Amino acid sequence: VNIIAVGVLPATRRNIVRSSNQTEDESSDRQAWNANYGLMRLKDFVDGFIIVDNQRISFQTNMEAMYLSYNDYIATCIADLVSGLFLERIDPRQYPELNPPVIDMNDIMTALSFDHKGRGKEPGFASIGRASAITCDLLNYILPLSKNKKIDTLMLARLAAKKQSISNINLNECEKNLALIRAPAKYLKKSEISINTKGIEEFMVKNSKLNECHLGVSLTKRNLVSLTTLFTFEKEQIPRLNEVINLARSYEDKSKNLANIES
C-alpha cells in the first residue's frame, strides 16, 4: 500500500514580527517540536510528504479566520490530483478522439519519492499549488452564445508556482515535479483555443534539477481550466523545514535544561 502523508508546519510568527508574549513564542517552539517529531517518525513508513505551511497565512490580521479557506484550497489541490475524474463521474472512453497524457497514482508516487543508490527509496517533501481560469464570461451561463476564451496556460503555471503551500520556497532547488491540467474536452482538441501543454511542460522541466516532470491532462465538465502542481524537494532544500527543525531542537534543549534545574 502506498502512503502519502500531509504534514503541517506551524506558523512561527516571531520571524515576521517579534512577539512581546514569551508564552506565545514558547508555544510556537513546542508546535515546531511536535511537527518535527511527527515528520521524523513517519519518514520510515510513508512514500512521500505533501507539506502544508501555516506560515503562508500568518501574515493575515486574523489568521484563524483563514484556516477554513486554506484547508479548502489544499483539499481541492489533492482531490484534483487523485480523484478528479471520479468526483465528476467522467468516463474518458466517451471521448475516443482524445488521447491526452494521463497521470495515475504510480506517477504521483514516483514524483513524491526518491530512489537513492545505496540508501534505497526515501520520501520526498513536496509543495502543492493550484491555479485556475474560467473559460467563458458570466453572461455565457445565461446566453451560451459567446466564444470560449483562449487560456494563457503559462500564466497559470506561474500563478500556481506563486500559490505553493510552503512559504519562501525556491523552485530552482526542486528535484522533480508533477503537473496536472484539467480542462473541458473542447480545449483538448486542435483549435485556436487548445491549451498549450508544451509551454507548461517546459516551465516545469526548467524548475527541476533532475529534468523530471510528470505531466498529465484530464477532463472536466466545468467551464474551467486548472493546473495543479507538485514540486518535490529533499528535506535539506526547504528553508522552512530547517527553521522548524532548529526551533524544535531549541525547545528540546530548553526543556532539558529546565528539567535539570527542577531536579
Regions found by a protein language model. Name each.
Residues V1-S263:
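Tubulin/FtsZ superfamily GTPase core signature
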